[in-house]
Swiss-Prot record:
Highest taxon, organism lineage: Bacteria
GO biological process: tRNA processing
GO CC annotations on file: cytoplasm
Cited NCBIfam families: PRK00211.1 (NF001238), sulf_tusC_dsrF (TIGR03010)
Cellular localization per UniProt: Cytoplasm
Family, as annotated: Belongs to the DsrF/TusC family.
Name used for this protein in its record: Protein TusC
Subunit record text: Heterohexamer, formed by a dimer of trimers. The hexameric TusBCD complex contains 2 copies each of TusB, TusC and TusD. The TusBCD complex interacts with TusE.
Chief site of localization: cytoplasm
Role: Part of a sulfur-relay system required for 2-thiolation of 5-methylaminomethyl-2-thiouridine (mnm(5)s(2)U) at tRNA wobble positions.
InterPro entries: DsrEFH-like, Sulphur_relay_DsrE/F-like, Sulphur_relay_TusC, Sulphur_relay_TusC/DsrF
Amino acid sequence: MKRIAFVFSTAPHGSTSGREGLDALLATSALTEALGVFFISDGVFQLLPGQKPDAVLARDYIATFKLFDLYDIDQCWICAASLRERGLENVNFVVDATPLEPVALRRELGNYDVILRF
């Protein structure tokens, strides 16, 4: 079975990309366990707690990330450089994601057959 990586690289609520990516991830998790989730660039903002999407008339889908355990999604990484650039090194995110430096993150991403970017 092919290994599938989901890469979140956009900020939440500015577009539907993050919500669509999360929906696709959860649907795919019903078909395979060979999944990895990566948060890079502005995608690290997807995991911030306490967001107020109603202020921009958007749906609050961020809490849905907390369902990763229920869906057996446990391979989750976040770019350490992206965290530093945005001053988010000491934040408690809504899911447990392992910080990786860019070289290690690219190496891990190279272990996947299919990469879907949102």
